From Swiss-Prot:
Spans annotated as Disordered: 30-99, 290-335, 358-396, 424-452, 467-617
Signal peptide segment: 1-21
Subunit composition and interactions: Binds to various extracellular matrix proteins.
Record function comment: Promotes cell adhesion and matrix assembly. May play a role in eye formation.
Species in which this protein is naturally found: Gallus gallus (Chicken)
UniProt feature, compositional bias: Basic residues: 495-506
Keyword Secreted in record: yes
InterPro entries reported for this sequence: DUF4174
Family note: Belongs to the CCDC80 family.
Protein's GO biological process: extracellular matrix organization; positive regulation of cell-substrate adhesion
Compositionally skewed regions (Basic and acidic residues) per UniProt: 425-438, 471-487, 547-589, 597-606
Alphabetical UniProt keywords: Extracellular matrix, Secreted, Signal
Protein name: Coiled-coil domain-containing protein 80
Upper lineage: Eukaryota, Metazoa, Chordata, Craniata, Vertebrata
Transmembrane feature ranges: none
Length: 958
């Protein structure tokens, strides 16, 4: 029985082992998604783990950090199946533990190799992008659009071609969000010899246009690839697969192009995926803005403030002063060791320069102390610091002049004063200098960037070198002091600087005496300070200035005491010289000796006249120089665009487009009051003349330019006023009320310059006749914002639908006139085509003026509106030139057309004016369906017909 206790102990030990193994298995299963623990007895020694290079703590995933980033310092996670096997297995010996650690190490290496492989793939794709560029100057410019965008190619001989100008006039600023929603990009080609060129117009998701120049060598290749005909206008619409979807030999309305694109099945998916795209695009507020883009993907847009805006390829505009997401840059800071002795309170002044992300250029800055202490400057080796910043700052370096002694040079950096880095360094600097009134001598160290900054009391004097001034000459308004704490600045520091370069030493003394006479030398803003600013802007005088600094900074007090006496003597001497020169000039004036006066004018210019009075006169002079000898001007002022007198005058000259063009008239219209105005310039030109662009768009709202132009011609009234000038820009006639253009033309024909033009135009055969071949653009411009067009097309005048439509139009002259409707009839097929234009008076009278339309114009109109000549069709064109509704079958009653017109916003304003004037048609003529109210019988009788034709109203808002 002695074996019983031993048996019981063995059973207990076995049960303990079994329970322990089950508990370990449950913990392993429970921790499959959490932290996996290994019993302490089965863990490898820490030294072995360190030697193997894989720690269980690092390999086990953490709940707070389940995913390891690529650039993280933590090793990547091992595969889940390996860890699961390790948690379930029970190691029984050291060999088992060693094998487990080897497997974990292999798993870590496996993940690391996957990570390296993934990075290699991205590097390969980047290298592919470098080897196969897709810029506008590369041969595969079309390949950059493949699979992503539709391409709309416009080809024209040159930019002044009539069809091209008409097509570009249809591309208003509010259409680019529609184009971006359909993934349309534009390529413009000019293929005439000598004017070959082009541009790629990339439309961003915000409706902005990034224009990239196209290599002229690619023009013939693209023309042959797209099968475009040379010497003619043509357009091609390409699918996303770069296959030709549609060809257009004439300009077409954008709705016709949208209709072709929207028929593709992929458009349904695009619409579902891009819900609200157009609203978001228009809300960005940059639709239609054109930005010139270079081929590297970046773009630069000039702004009126003088700086530059950097725009990325995605269309994002960065701020002019700060740019985000800047790469790591290496900047070199020169740290001079400065020894300064001074007692007044310090003043800190910083100048922030405009941001440019292309390059960092150096500018020279010298800060001069008011008390002129003795300074010893020792330049140390340059130290390179590398850091990454979110707000871009332009560092200013100070290059030491070539002189043995300099007055307190400093290396300062323009920083972002709102960044936490600057605040922290500012606090460190203040803690490092508790006693600012004592002299501080500091040795620059490599560890701290700001330790070399010696705070000394200064009356700041900043003068730039020629290089820096040429770069920032237009950016004076951008150099603002955002941290202005200089409380002791006297008014003398804000005086305008002199720009005259002194020629001789005696003249330099005279300049100094003038400043000494104006300002008190005992004040911090010393006369020497102003003298330094005046001379410091001229690079050849830097040596003399440094010598002057050297002479002024010597510690001998004797010279400082003697200086006022010398200044008084030189001042008296200068006055004597002036008096002698003046008397000598008066004596020699009768002998016509202008040498002395010219020398004096060179020595003593009037610096205040040029910078303030010259630019406005020069701007107006430049504006008028464009027209002088070439064009005649009609200048009109009006308080607002919808002024009644202005609208009447505008309609007058728009009706006489050809006569205005033959007389070379340009119209400058100024809207608004004397203090707040905008300007518009219209040039009336013949088809063979190149389009003119006199000034940029920002100059059209230049208040100073408009004010000077008003004063130049005496147009200082806020009411309607009109001025007529000849080619010499001299006023010929004033008009205070609208005038018929026939009387204006009769007056112009009496000008001597016009008589010569008439003789020359008669020899060249340039005349304006009603049957003269006119372009589609000039024809449509007659009706834009003045008349609504009802275009009726039929294969012949015997067509049944055409005759039915004519029956419905009979007796509607009054309704057509009050609604400003003009009927345009296009008849015929093939070569036997023609047309008739019927004009109805706007006062509602029954008289009708008819004009014949030539065959070439009928063909152009049908091509423009995409009208088939083989079938009957009728369409309504609004005053804005857009098609409002299509009618493929005759309308038995014009009530439906009147209903659509009367719902337009512009028509409602017309109705209000006509009702106030009592203008209406008799009830018996229009049968009760005028613009006042519908007769109940017509309302019920044509309700079904309206529903039938409702599908042809394409949902236009007006």
């Amino acid at each position: 029985m002695n074996w019983m206790p031993a048996l019981s102990l063995a059973l207990l030990w076995t049960a303990w082992l079994v329970c322990g193994s089950e508990k370990t298995g449950r913990l392993a299963e429970r921790g499959s998604h959490g932290v996996r623990k290994v019993p302490q007895s089965h863990r490898a020694p820490s030294s072995l783990l360190r030697r193997s290079g894989a720690s269980l703590k690092n390999l086990s995933p953490s709940p707070q950090h389940p995913v390891t980033k690529r650039d993280s310092s933590v090793p990547p996670k091992a595969p889940a199946n390996l860890l699961k096997e390790e948690s379930r297995s029970q190691p029984r010996s050291v060999g088992t533990r060693t094998r487990r650690l080897q497997r974990l190490t292999a798993a870590a290496k496996y993940s690391k190799s996957e990570m390296i492989k993934d990075e290699g793939i991205s590097t390969a794709s980047q290298s592919r992008a470098v080897r196969f560029p897709s810029g506008s100057s590369s041969p595969n410019v079309l390949a950059s659009f493949a699979g992503k965008n539709r391409v709309w190619v416009i080809s024209a001989p040159h930019a002044s071609e009539g069809y091209y100008r008409l097509m570009m006039s249809l591309l208003k600023n509010d259409v680019y969000c529609e184009l971006a929603e359909r993934h349309i990009q534009q390529i413009v080609l000019f293929h005439e010899e000598g004017e070959e060129g082009g541009k790629v117009r990339r439309i961003t998701n915000e409706g902005k246009i990034l224009e990239q120049p196209l290599d002229p060598a690619l023009i013939p290749k693209l023309m042959s690839f797209l099968k475009l005909e040379k010497g003619k206008f043509g357009m091609v619409l390409l699918k996303k697969t770069l296959q030709v979807e549609e060809r257009y030999p004439y300009p077409v309305r954008l709705e016709a192009m949208y209709e072709v694109i929207d028929q593709n099945p992929i458009r349904k998916i695009e619409k579902m995926r891009q819900k609200g795209f157009i609203q978001t695009c228009k809300a960005a507020g940059v639709e239609g803005q054109v930005v010139e883009d270079d081929n590297n993907g970046g773009s630069t847009q000039s702004i009126p403030g003088g700086g530059h805006v950097q725009v990325s390829a995605g269309g994002r505009k960065e701020e002019p002063r700060r740019s985000s997401n800047q790469p790591t840059r290496t900047k070199t800071v020169r740290k001079p060791m400065t020894t300064t002795v001074a007692t007044p309170l310090p003043t800190v002044r910083t100048t922030t320069l405009p941001t440019t992300t292309t390059a960092t250029r150096a500018t020279t800055r010298t800060v001069t102390t008011a008390s002129r202490p003795t300074t010893t400057t020792t330049p140390l080796p340059t130290t390179q610091r590398t850091w990454t910043t979110k707000s871009h700052t332009t560092t200013e370096y100070h290059r030491l002049p070539a002189s043995p002694e300099v007055t307190t040079p400093r290396v300062m950096a323009s920083e972002d004063f709102y960044s936490p880095v600057w605040k922290a360094n500012r606090r460190d600097r203040q803690r490092g200098h508790p006693e600012k009134h004592l002299a501080a001598t500091r040795k620059p160290s490599k560890g701290g960037r700001y330790e070399s900054f010696t705070e000394v009391p200064t009356a700041p004097s900043v003068h730039y070198t020629k290089a820096s001034m040429s770069r920032f000459k237009d950016n004076r308004t951008d150099r603002k002091d955002y941290n202005h704490r200089d409380l002791n600045v006297t008014p003398g520091q804000h005086k305008p600087t002199k720009t005259k370069p002194p020629k001789k030493k005696t003249q330099e003394k005279i300049l100094s005496n003038e400043y000494e006479d104006k300002y008190d030398p005992s004040k911090p803003a010393s006369p020497h300070l102003e003298e330094e600013i005046a001379v410091g802007s001229i690079p050849p005088k830097k040596g003399k200035e440094s010598k002057k600094h050297e002479r002024m900074d010597k510690p001998e007090k004797k010279k400082k005491k003697d200086r006022p006496d010398k200044l008084h003597k030189s001042e008296k001497q200068s006055k004597k010289d002036k008096a002698e020169k003046k008397s000598k000039q008066d004596k020699d004036r009768s002998k016509k000796n202008k040498k002395g006066s010219r020398t004096e004018n060179e020595d003593f210019p009037k610096p205040n006249k040029k910078p303030f009075l010259q630019p406005p006169r020069k701007s107006v002079a430049n504006l008028l120089d464009y027209f002088e000898g070439k064009r005649r001007l009609i200048l009109i002022t009006t308080p607002k665009a919808d002024n009644t007198m202005y609208v009447q005058q505008r309609d007058e000259y728009l009706e006489s487009f050809c006569k205005m063009a033959t007389r070379k008239i340009s119209v400058i219209t100024i809207f608004g009051t004397m203090n707040n105005s905008s300007m518009k310039i219209d040039h009336f030109q013949l088809d063979n003349e190149k389009p003119m662009k006199v000034i940029e768009d920002e100059d059209l709202v230049d208040q100073q330019l408009i004010s000077e132009l008003r004063k130049e011609y005496g147009m200082t009234y806020n009411d309607f006023f009109m001025v007529l000038t000849d080619t010499d820009m001299k006023v010929k006639q004033y008009y205070e009320v609208p005038i018929a253009m026939k009387s204006v033309f009769d007056l112009i024909d009496t000008f001597q310059s016009r008589i010569k033009d008439m003789e020359r135009q008669k020899k060249e055969g340039i005349v304006c006749k009603e049957d003269k071949k006119q372009s589609l653009e000039s024809f449509l411009s007659r009706f834009r914002w003045r008349r609504r067009l009802v275009v009726i097309s039929a294969p012949s005048d015997e067509d049944w639908a055409y005759s039915q439509q004519l029956a419905a139009l009979s007796g509607q002259a009054c309704n057509f006139g009050l609604r400003h409707i003009t009927i345009l009839k296009l008849l015929g097929v093939g070569e036997d085509i023609g047309g008739v234009l019927e004009l109805y008076p706007i006062n509602g009278s029954a008289t009708v003026d008819r004009e014949d339309i030539p065959a070439n114009l009928v063909k152009d109109i049908r091509n423009y509106f995409q009208i088939s000549p083989e079938y009957f069709s009728m369409l309504l064109v609004g005053k804005d030139g857009n098609v409002k509704s299509w009618y493929p079958s005759p309308m038995w009653s014009m009530a439906i057309v009147y209903d659509l017109i009367d719902s337009m916003q512009l028509r409602r304003q017309e109705m209000t004016i006509q009702q106030s004037l009592g203008m209406q048609c008799p009830e018996d003529e229009y049968g009760g369906y005028g613009y006042h109210s519908y007769h109940q019988g017509y309302q019920e009788g044509y309700q079904d017909d309206y529903r039938h034709h409702g599908s042809y109203h394409h949902g236009y808002p007006y």
